[in-house]
Every structure is written in C-alpha cells, then in structure tokens.
C-alpha cells in the first residue's frame, strides 16, 4: 500500500480522534494510525508528549498482564482542539475534493 505523507498536525488530529472515542495506550494508537500512515513510534511519542504538555491529553498507568501501560485520555482543552482540527480537516478535504473534481482552479 502507498501512503501519502502526513504532517505532525495530522498525526495530532488522528491521536485526538482516537482518544476521544476511548482512552488508549501508545502502541494501540500507533497501530491505528498505521492503517493510513507509515509512522514509527519515534515519531508518535514526541507528538503524544507535546499533546500532554499542551494540556490536550492526560496520562495514567494501568497494569495489563503484569506490565504497566501508559494510557492517554483527552481533556476538555483536547476536545476543543479536536473540534477546531475537525473543522480545518473538513475545509482542507473540501478544497482537495474541489481540485480533483475540477471545481477549484487558480
């Protein structure tokens, strides 16, 4: 499968979308994003840290099969950011569709 390049902002949007539906741990998030983007954990974790520092997600640890997993949970600020990013994504997608369909020309 060919993957289109993705930006850090798009990864942030995907992360917030994933943790908005339910709290998730890093590996689970990365595997979901890998459906559409060829990212490495070394790319994902700094973005998760940035979202945490920005107050968009919080973390907690939970034991699973004898090991601790770090879970990410969306905050109210994260929900607000998700609404904003969703609007931006829809606008971007509509513009791309317009170019593809020939409705938008320079």
Can you annotate each of these PLM segments?
Residues 2-43:
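N-terminal helix-turn-helix DNA-binding core of bacterial DNA-binding proteins
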Residues 48-50:
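Short, hydrophobic-biased segments on the C-terminal half of alpha helices
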Residues 83-106:
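Amphipathic alpha-helical dimerization/coiled-coil segments
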């Amino acid at each position: 499968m060919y993957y289109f390049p993705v930006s850090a902002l798009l990864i942030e949007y995907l992360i917030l979308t994933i943790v908005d539906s339910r709290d998730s741990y890093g590996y689970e998030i990365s595997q979901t994003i890998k459906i559409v983007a060829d990212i490495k954990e070394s790319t994902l974790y700094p973005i998760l840290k940035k979202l945490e520092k920005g107050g968009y997600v919080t973390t907690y640890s939970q034991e699973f099969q004898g090991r601790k997993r770090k879970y990410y949970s969306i905050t109210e600020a994260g929900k607000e950011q998700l609404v904003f990013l969703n609007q931006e994504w829809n606008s971007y997608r509509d513009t791309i569709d317009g170019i593809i369909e020939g409705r938008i020309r320079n």
